[in-house]
Protein backbone atom coordinates (compact mmCIF):
# COMPACT_ATOMS: atom_id res chain seq x y z
CA UNK A 1 0.00 0.00 0.00
CA UNK A 2 1.04 3.61 -0.47
CA UNK A 3 0.59 4.80 3.11
CA UNK A 4 4.15 5.17 4.35
CA UNK A 5 4.81 8.49 6.09
CA UNK A 6 8.48 9.36 6.24
CA UNK A 7 8.63 9.65 10.04
CA UNK A 8 9.36 6.34 11.75
CA UNK A 9 8.95 5.96 15.51
CA UNK A 10 9.99 2.60 16.86
CA UNK A 11 7.57 1.26 19.45
CA UNK A 12 8.95 -0.09 22.74
CA UNK A 13 9.14 -3.84 22.21
CA UNK A 14 7.69 -4.74 25.59
CA UNK A 15 4.98 -2.07 25.73
CA UNK A 16 2.09 -4.49 25.31
CA UNK A 17 3.29 -6.47 28.33
CA UNK A 18 2.67 -3.52 30.67
CA UNK A 19 -0.56 -2.36 32.29
CA UNK A 20 -1.76 0.49 30.05
CA UNK A 21 -3.69 2.17 32.87
CA UNK A 22 -0.57 2.17 35.04
CA UNK A 23 1.47 3.57 32.15
CA UNK A 24 -1.09 6.35 31.71
CA UNK A 25 -1.00 7.17 35.43
CA UNK A 26 2.77 7.49 35.31
CA UNK A 27 2.58 9.90 32.40
CA UNK A 28 -0.24 11.83 34.04
CA UNK A 29 1.80 12.36 37.18
CA UNK A 30 4.59 13.85 35.10
CA UNK A 31 2.30 16.13 33.09
CA UNK A 32 0.34 17.37 36.09
CA UNK A 33 3.36 19.36 37.25
CA UNK A 34 3.39 21.50 34.10
CA UNK A 35 -0.32 21.56 33.22
CA UNK A 36 -1.06 25.08 34.47
CA UNK A 37 1.93 26.62 32.74
CA UNK A 38 1.25 24.82 29.46
CA UNK A 39 -2.42 25.76 29.51
CA UNK A 40 -1.46 29.40 29.95
CA UNK A 41 1.04 29.20 27.09
CA UNK A 42 -1.25 27.39 24.66
CA UNK A 43 0.30 26.18 21.44
CA UNK A 44 1.28 22.57 20.90
CA UNK A 45 1.95 19.93 23.55
CA UNK A 46 4.81 18.56 21.50
CA UNK A 47 6.89 17.07 24.31
CA UNK A 48 3.88 15.47 25.95
CA UNK A 49 2.70 13.97 22.68
CA UNK A 50 6.16 12.50 22.25
CA UNK A 51 5.85 11.03 25.75
CA UNK A 52 2.67 9.30 24.63
CA UNK A 53 4.36 8.12 21.47
CA UNK A 54 7.28 6.66 23.40
CA UNK A 55 4.95 4.91 25.83
CA UNK A 56 3.44 2.76 23.09
CA UNK A 57 -0.08 3.76 24.09
CA UNK A 58 -0.87 4.97 20.58
CA UNK A 59 -1.37 1.31 19.65
CA UNK A 60 -3.64 0.68 22.63
CA UNK A 61 -6.58 -0.55 20.53
CA UNK A 62 -4.50 -2.20 17.82
CA UNK A 63 -5.01 -5.99 17.97
CA UNK A 64 -2.06 -8.00 19.23
CA UNK A 65 -1.72 -9.86 15.93
CA UNK A 66 -0.73 -6.52 14.39
CA UNK A 67 1.69 -5.65 17.19
CA UNK A 68 -0.57 -3.58 19.42
CA UNK A 69 -1.73 -3.83 23.02
CA UNK A 70 -5.01 -5.45 22.02
CA UNK A 71 -6.80 -3.59 24.82
CA UNK A 72 -10.56 -3.72 25.15
CA UNK A 73 -12.82 -0.68 25.21
CA UNK A 74 -13.25 -0.54 29.01
CA UNK A 75 -9.47 -0.37 29.39
CA UNK A 76 -9.11 2.26 26.68
CA UNK A 77 -11.77 4.39 28.35
CA UNK A 78 -9.92 4.20 31.68
CA UNK A 79 -6.71 5.34 29.99
CA UNK A 80 -8.49 8.34 28.46
CA UNK A 81 -9.85 9.29 31.86
CA UNK A 82 -6.46 9.02 33.58
CA UNK A 83 -4.85 11.28 30.99
CA UNK A 84 -7.68 13.83 31.04
CA UNK A 85 -7.52 14.06 34.83
CA UNK A 86 -4.00 15.45 34.52
CA UNK A 87 -4.50 17.52 31.37
CA UNK A 88 -7.76 18.01 29.50
CA UNK A 89 -6.00 18.91 26.26
CA UNK A 90 -3.98 15.70 26.26
CA UNK A 91 -7.04 13.65 27.15
CA UNK A 92 -8.81 15.33 24.24
CA UNK A 93 -5.96 14.55 21.81
CA UNK A 94 -5.57 10.95 22.91
CA UNK A 95 -9.33 10.46 22.88
CA UNK A 96 -9.54 11.66 19.30
CA UNK A 97 -6.70 9.33 18.37
CA UNK A 98 -8.70 6.41 19.78
CA UNK A 99 -11.77 7.63 17.88
CA UNK A 100 -9.90 7.90 14.58
CA UNK A 101 -8.01 4.62 14.50
CA UNK A 102 -11.02 2.26 14.66
CA UNK A 103 -12.37 3.82 11.47
CA UNK A 104 -9.82 1.64 9.69
CA UNK A 105 -11.59 -1.44 10.98
CA UNK A 106 -15.12 -0.03 10.73
CA UNK A 107 -15.14 0.98 7.07
CA UNK A 108 -11.78 -0.08 5.62
CA UNK A 109 -10.81 -3.32 3.90
CA UNK A 110 -9.06 -6.25 5.56
CA UNK A 111 -5.88 -5.28 3.73
CA UNK A 112 -6.10 -1.69 4.99
CA UNK A 113 -6.78 -2.89 8.52
CA UNK A 114 -3.73 -5.14 8.52
CA UNK A 115 -1.44 -2.56 6.93
CA UNK A 116 -2.48 0.52 8.89
CA UNK A 117 -2.81 -1.16 12.26
CA UNK A 118 0.64 -2.68 11.78
CA UNK A 119 2.10 0.69 10.88
CA UNK A 120 0.48 2.40 13.87
CA UNK A 121 1.87 -0.27 16.20
CA UNK A 122 5.35 -0.54 14.74
CA UNK A 123 5.94 3.16 14.23
CA UNK A 124 3.81 4.74 16.96
CA UNK A 125 1.76 6.82 14.58
CA UNK A 126 -0.43 9.61 15.87
CA UNK A 127 -3.71 9.95 13.99
CA UNK A 128 -5.43 13.26 13.34
CA UNK A 129 -8.85 14.17 12.03
CA UNK A 130 -9.97 16.52 9.28
CA UNK A 131 -13.71 16.15 9.02
CA UNK A 132 -15.52 19.28 10.24
CA UNK A 133 -15.99 22.47 8.27
CA UNK A 134 -17.06 25.95 9.32
CA UNK A 135 -19.96 26.47 6.93
CA UNK A 136 -23.73 27.00 7.24
CA UNK A 137 -24.32 23.80 9.24
CA UNK A 138 -22.28 20.88 10.54
CA UNK A 139 -22.78 18.69 7.46
CA UNK A 140 -22.31 21.48 4.92
CA UNK A 141 -19.05 20.10 3.57
CA UNK A 142 -17.31 21.88 0.72
CA UNK A 143 -13.86 20.27 0.61
CA UNK A 144 -13.93 18.77 -2.86
CA UNK A 145 -12.79 15.31 -3.87
CA UNK A 146 -12.18 15.14 -7.61
CA UNK A 147 -11.96 11.57 -8.98
CA UNK A 148 -8.82 10.58 -10.87
CA UNK A 149 -8.50 7.95 -13.58
CA UNK A 150 -6.62 5.56 -11.30
CA UNK A 151 -9.48 5.38 -8.78
CA UNK A 152 -8.09 7.96 -6.39
CA UNK A 153 -9.05 11.56 -5.72
CA UNK A 154 -7.63 15.06 -5.44
CA UNK A 155 -8.69 17.09 -2.40
CA UNK A 156 -9.07 20.87 -2.29
CA UNK A 157 -10.45 23.09 0.44
CA UNK A 158 -10.18 23.78 4.15
CA UNK A 159 -11.26 21.74 7.15
CA UNK A 160 -11.78 23.22 10.62
CA UNK A 161 -11.59 21.95 14.20
CA UNK A 162 -8.94 19.44 13.13
CA UNK A 163 -7.95 18.16 16.57
CA UNK A 164 -4.56 16.51 16.50
CA UNK A 165 -3.92 17.07 12.80
CA UNK A 166 -0.79 19.06 13.51
CA UNK A 167 1.94 16.68 14.61
CA UNK A 168 0.08 13.60 13.41
CA UNK A 169 1.34 10.95 11.04
CA UNK A 170 -1.94 9.70 9.62
CA UNK A 171 -4.87 11.96 8.78
CA UNK A 172 -8.49 10.89 8.39
CA UNK A 173 -10.28 13.18 5.98
CA UNK A 174 -13.66 13.45 4.27
CA UNK A 175 -14.38 15.06 0.93
CA UNK A 176 -17.40 15.58 -1.31
CA UNK A 177 -17.22 14.52 -4.94
CA UNK A 178 -17.85 17.66 -6.96
CA UNK A 179 -17.71 16.88 -10.65
CA UNK A 180 -20.03 15.56 -13.36
CA UNK A 181 -19.27 11.89 -12.70
CA UNK A 182 -21.82 9.38 -11.35
CA UNK A 183 -20.18 9.92 -7.95
CA UNK A 184 -21.26 13.57 -7.79
CA UNK A 185 -22.29 14.54 -4.25
CA UNK A 186 -20.93 11.37 -2.68
CA UNK A 187 -18.83 11.58 0.49
CA UNK A 188 -15.51 9.78 0.46
CA UNK A 189 -13.34 8.93 3.47
CA UNK A 190 -9.61 8.46 3.31
CA UNK A 191 -6.56 7.89 5.49
CA UNK A 192 -3.54 9.75 4.13
CA UNK A 193 -0.09 10.69 5.43
CA UNK A 194 -0.22 14.09 7.11
CA UNK A 195 3.09 14.81 5.38
CA UNK A 196 1.49 14.48 1.95
CA UNK A 197 2.24 17.40 -0.37
CA UNK A 198 -0.49 20.03 -0.19
CA UNK A 199 -1.63 19.21 3.37
CA UNK A 200 -1.10 22.18 5.71
CA UNK A 201 -2.27 22.05 9.35
CA UNK A 202 -2.47 25.67 10.50
CA UNK A 203 -1.60 27.30 13.83
CA UNK A 204 -4.91 29.13 14.13
CA UNK A 205 -6.63 27.44 17.08
CA UNK A 206 -7.91 29.94 19.64
CA UNK A 207 -10.51 29.17 22.30
CA UNK A 208 -11.00 29.68 26.02
CA UNK A 209 -10.20 26.04 26.68
CA UNK A 210 -8.51 22.96 25.23
CA UNK A 211 -5.68 25.30 24.36
CA UNK A 212 -3.11 22.63 23.48
CA UNK A 213 -5.22 20.48 21.18
CA UNK A 214 -4.15 22.07 17.87
CA UNK A 215 -7.81 22.06 16.85
CA UNK A 216 -7.38 24.66 14.13
CA UNK A 217 -7.85 24.46 10.38
CA UNK A 218 -6.13 22.30 7.80
CA UNK A 219 -5.74 23.32 4.17
CA UNK A 220 -5.79 20.85 1.28
CA UNK A 221 -4.31 22.09 -1.98
CA UNK A 222 -4.35 19.55 -4.81
CA UNK A 223 -3.77 16.72 -2.33
CA UNK A 224 -3.54 13.33 -4.02
CA UNK A 225 -5.42 10.46 -2.42
CA UNK A 226 -4.21 7.12 -3.73
CA UNK A 227 -6.82 4.46 -4.52
CA UNK A 228 -5.73 2.22 -1.65
CA UNK A 229 -6.02 5.13 0.81
CA UNK A 230 -9.76 5.44 0.24
CA UNK A 231 -11.73 3.80 3.05
CA UNK A 232 -14.71 2.02 1.55
CA UNK A 233 -16.74 2.93 -1.50
CA UNK A 234 -18.18 6.42 -2.06
CA UNK A 235 -20.83 7.10 0.59
CA UNK A 236 -19.82 3.95 2.52
CA UNK A 237 -19.69 5.90 5.77
CA UNK A 238 -23.07 7.53 5.15
CA UNK A 239 -24.70 4.22 4.23
CA UNK A 240 -23.30 2.66 7.39
CA UNK A 241 -25.34 5.16 9.41
CA UNK A 242 -28.47 4.75 7.31
CA UNK A 243 -28.34 0.97 7.62
CA UNK A 244 -27.02 0.87 11.22
CA UNK A 245 -24.00 -1.09 10.05
CA UNK A 246 -20.78 -1.43 11.98
CA UNK A 247 -19.40 1.84 10.65
CA UNK A 248 -22.19 3.66 12.49
CA UNK A 249 -20.48 2.75 15.78
CA UNK A 250 -18.28 5.78 15.18
CA UNK A 251 -20.85 8.00 16.92
CA UNK A 252 -21.26 6.07 20.20
CA UNK A 253 -17.50 5.50 20.35
CA UNK A 254 -16.75 9.21 19.92
CA UNK A 255 -19.47 10.32 22.33
CA UNK A 256 -18.39 7.86 25.03
CA UNK A 257 -14.79 8.99 24.71
CA UNK A 258 -15.85 12.64 24.95
CA UNK A 259 -17.85 11.89 28.09
CA UNK A 260 -14.86 10.25 29.70
CA UNK A 261 -12.63 13.19 28.85
CA UNK A 262 -15.09 15.34 30.83
CA UNK A 263 -15.14 12.86 33.72
CA UNK A 264 -11.36 12.79 33.80
CA UNK A 265 -11.25 16.58 33.94
CA UNK A 266 -13.83 16.55 36.75
CA UNK A 267 -11.69 14.10 38.72
CA UNK A 268 -8.68 16.34 38.14
CA UNK A 269 -10.57 19.38 39.39
CA UNK A 270 -11.80 17.54 42.48
CA UNK A 271 -8.34 16.20 43.32
CA UNK A 272 -6.70 19.62 42.92
CA UNK A 273 -9.39 21.36 44.97
CA UNK A 274 -9.18 18.78 47.75
CA UNK A 275 -5.43 19.27 48.04
CA UNK A 276 -5.87 23.05 48.13
CA UNK A 277 -8.63 22.89 50.74
CA UNK A 278 -6.54 20.63 52.94
CA UNK A 279 -3.35 22.67 52.72
CA UNK A 280 -4.16 26.30 51.89
CA UNK A 281 -7.83 27.20 52.34
CA UNK A 282 -8.65 29.35 55.38
CA UNK A 283 -11.56 28.67 57.74
CA UNK A 284 -14.50 31.06 57.67
CA UNK A 285 -14.34 32.87 61.03
CA UNK A 286 -18.11 32.96 61.79
CA UNK A 287 -18.20 29.18 61.39
CA UNK A 288 -16.30 28.77 64.66
CA UNK A 289 -13.91 26.16 63.27
CA UNK A 290 -10.14 25.79 63.26
CA UNK A 291 -9.62 24.39 59.75
CA UNK A 292 -11.38 24.75 56.42
CA UNK A 293 -11.76 20.98 56.27
CA UNK A 294 -14.14 21.18 59.25
CA UNK A 295 -16.62 23.53 57.58
CA UNK A 296 -19.97 21.69 57.24
CA UNK A 297 -20.85 23.41 53.98
CA UNK A 298 -17.47 22.58 52.49
CA UNK A 299 -17.88 18.97 53.59
CA UNK A 300 -21.32 18.83 52.01
CA UNK A 301 -19.99 20.25 48.75
CA UNK A 302 -17.28 17.61 48.54
CA UNK A 303 -19.88 14.97 49.25
CA UNK A 304 -22.09 16.23 46.44
CA UNK A 305 -19.16 16.39 44.02
CA UNK A 306 -18.12 12.84 44.84
CA UNK A 307 -21.64 11.43 44.61
CA UNK A 308 -22.16 13.05 41.20
CA UNK A 309 -18.93 11.48 39.96
CA UNK A 310 -19.80 8.09 41.42
CA UNK A 311 -23.00 7.97 39.40
CA UNK A 312 -21.46 9.25 36.18
CA UNK A 313 -18.42 6.97 36.52
CA UNK A 314 -20.59 3.91 37.05
CA UNK A 315 -22.75 4.73 34.04
CA UNK A 316 -19.66 5.34 31.90
CA UNK A 317 -18.09 2.02 32.83
CA UNK A 318 -21.35 0.20 32.16
CA UNK A 319 -21.54 1.83 28.74
CA UNK A 320 -17.91 0.88 28.00
CA UNK A 321 -18.69 -2.78 28.68
CA UNK A 322 -21.78 -2.58 26.49
CA UNK A 323 -19.67 -1.03 23.73
CA UNK A 324 -17.29 -3.98 23.94
CA UNK A 325 -20.19 -6.43 23.71
CA UNK A 326 -21.59 -4.66 20.66
CA UNK A 327 -18.14 -4.28 19.10
CA UNK A 328 -17.49 -8.01 19.41
CA UNK A 329 -20.59 -8.77 17.33
CA UNK A 330 -18.80 -7.55 14.22
CA UNK A 331 -20.97 -7.62 11.13
CA UNK A 332 -23.73 -9.39 13.10
CA UNK A 333 -24.56 -6.00 14.62
CA UNK A 334 -28.30 -5.24 14.57
CA UNK A 335 -30.08 -1.87 14.61
CA UNK A 336 -31.33 -2.76 18.08
CA UNK A 337 -27.77 -3.41 19.31
CA UNK A 338 -26.65 -0.09 17.96
CA UNK A 339 -29.70 1.73 19.28
CA UNK A 340 -29.41 0.38 22.83
CA UNK A 341 -25.74 1.37 22.91
CA UNK A 342 -26.42 4.89 21.67
CA UNK A 343 -29.18 5.44 24.23
CA UNK A 344 -26.83 4.30 26.99
CA UNK A 345 -24.01 6.52 25.73
CA UNK A 346 -26.35 9.51 25.39
CA UNK A 347 -27.24 9.19 29.05
CA UNK A 348 -23.58 9.00 30.00
CA UNK A 349 -22.80 12.08 27.91
CA UNK A 350 -25.48 14.07 29.74
CA UNK A 351 -24.40 12.84 33.18
CA UNK A 352 -20.72 13.50 32.48
CA UNK A 353 -21.30 16.96 31.00
CA UNK A 354 -23.44 18.13 33.89
CA UNK A 355 -21.19 16.63 36.56
CA UNK A 356 -18.02 18.05 35.03
CA UNK A 357 -19.45 21.54 34.52
CA UNK A 358 -20.88 21.65 38.04
CA UNK A 359 -17.73 20.34 39.71
CA UNK A 360 -15.26 22.43 37.71
CA UNK A 361 -17.29 25.54 38.59
CA UNK A 362 -18.26 24.50 42.11
CA UNK A 363 -14.72 23.91 43.34
CA UNK A 364 -14.28 27.67 43.63
CA UNK A 365 -16.83 27.63 46.46
CA UNK A 366 -14.60 25.32 48.49
CA UNK A 367 -11.20 26.85 47.74
CA UNK A 368 -12.09 30.49 48.35
CA UNK A 369 -11.06 33.78 46.78
CA UNK A 370 -7.30 33.21 47.01
CA UNK A 371 -7.69 30.09 44.89
CA UNK A 372 -8.68 32.21 41.91
CA UNK A 373 -5.09 33.40 41.44
CA UNK A 374 -3.83 32.41 37.97
CA UNK A 375 -0.87 30.53 39.43
CA UNK A 376 -3.22 27.77 40.57
CA UNK A 377 -4.99 27.42 37.23
CA UNK A 378 -8.26 26.16 38.68
CA UNK A 379 -10.11 27.87 35.86
CA UNK A 380 -8.60 25.53 33.28
CA UNK A 381 -10.84 22.65 34.34
CA UNK A 382 -14.06 24.54 33.65
CA UNK A 383 -12.71 26.16 30.48
CA UNK A 384 -11.71 22.79 29.06
CA UNK A 385 -15.05 21.14 29.80
CA UNK A 386 -17.08 24.13 28.65
CA UNK A 387 -15.19 24.41 25.38
CA UNK A 388 -15.48 20.80 24.31
CA UNK A 389 -18.95 20.12 25.73
CA UNK A 390 -20.26 22.53 23.09
CA UNK A 391 -19.19 20.03 20.40
CA UNK A 392 -22.82 18.94 20.13
CA UNK A 393 -25.77 20.07 22.28
CA UNK A 394 -26.27 17.82 25.29
CA UNK A 395 -29.98 18.68 25.28
CA UNK A 396 -30.37 16.44 22.25
CA UNK A 397 -28.74 13.57 24.12
CA UNK A 398 -31.27 13.99 26.91
CA UNK A 399 -34.06 14.08 24.33
CA UNK A 400 -32.78 10.86 22.74
CA UNK A 401 -32.98 9.11 26.10
CA UNK A 402 -36.45 10.52 26.69
CA UNK A 403 -37.73 9.42 23.29
CA UNK A 404 -36.53 5.90 23.95
CA UNK A 405 -38.00 5.76 27.44
CA UNK A 406 -41.38 7.19 26.43
CA UNK A 407 -41.83 6.00 22.85
CA UNK A 408 -39.31 3.19 22.39
CA UNK A 409 -37.48 5.16 19.70
CA UNK A 410 -33.76 4.80 19.08
CA UNK A 411 -31.63 7.80 18.09
CA UNK A 412 -31.42 8.32 14.35
CA UNK A 413 -27.87 7.19 13.47
CA UNK A 414 -25.60 10.09 12.59
CA UNK A 415 -22.16 11.49 13.27
CA UNK A 416 -23.14 12.47 16.83
CA UNK A 417 -26.08 10.17 17.54
From Swiss-Prot:
Misc. remarks from the entry: Reduced flavin is provided by flavin reductase DszD.
Cellular compartments annotated: Cytoplasm
Protein name (database record): Dibenzothiophene monooxygenase
Species of the source: Rhodococcus erythropolis (strain XP)
Region (First lid loop): 131-142
Domain remark in the UniProt entry: The lid loop assumes one of 2 conformations allowing opening and closing of the active site; in the 3D structure one dimer is open while the other is closed. Another structure with FMN (3X0Y) proposes a different lid loop that may interact with the loop predicted here.
Metabolic or biological pathway, per its Swiss-Prot or TrEMBL entry: Sulfur metabolism; dibenzothiophene degradation
Result, substituting residue 92 to F: No production of DBTO2 from DBT
Residues reported to bind dibenzothiophene: 92, 129, 205
Amino acid sequence: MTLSPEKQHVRPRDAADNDPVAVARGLAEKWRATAVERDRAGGSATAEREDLRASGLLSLLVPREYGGWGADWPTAIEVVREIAAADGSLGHLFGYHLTNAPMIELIGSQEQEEHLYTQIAQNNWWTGNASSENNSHVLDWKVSATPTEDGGYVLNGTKHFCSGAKGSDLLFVFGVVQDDSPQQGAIIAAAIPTSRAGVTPNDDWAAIGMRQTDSGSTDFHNVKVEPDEVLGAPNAFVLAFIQSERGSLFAPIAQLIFANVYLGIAHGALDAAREYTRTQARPWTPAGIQQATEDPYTIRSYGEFTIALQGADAAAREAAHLLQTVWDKGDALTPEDRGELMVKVSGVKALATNAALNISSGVFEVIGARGTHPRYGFDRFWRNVRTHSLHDPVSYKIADVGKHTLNGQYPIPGFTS
